[in-house]
Amino acid sequence: MAPPLPRTPTPTHPHSHAPPLPRTPTPAHPHSHAPPLPRTPTPTHPHSHAPPRSIQHRQGKDTKVNLYFPIDSKNPLSFLLGPTLKTRWCVVPVSFTFPLPDTDWLV
């Protein structure tokens, strides 16, 4: 009789003796042993471990640039609005009066 073939783990047989395959991290399995892929920062994930992009100035200095939240010294809210939006203030009357709930049943 031939020896059994090595099998990869399955949900019904998770204790297979075959070596596990390396997997890349996923949201459901973030602790994979495969090396993580380098990612560039995004607005939803600004703390990426990818190296920051840099630009070359005329003086020859290498400066880090934040591509997603540019800073404009003229407008203190530019980091919230982005490079293309302007700050617009508008006053809207809002009423905060609410009818009180019926408390007769508490007595």
Swiss-Prot record:
Q: Where are the sequence repeats?
A: 2-17, 18-33, 34-49
Q: Which UniProt keywords apply?
A: Repeat
Task: Write down what this protein is called.
Answer: Latency-related protein 2
Q: What are the Basic residues biased-composition ranges?
A: 46-58
**Where are the stretches annotated 3 X 17 AA tandem repeats?**
2-49
Q: Which organism is it from?
A: Human herpesvirus 1 (strain F)
Q: Where is the composition biased (Pro residues)?
A: 1-44
Segment Disordered: which positions? Answer: 1-63
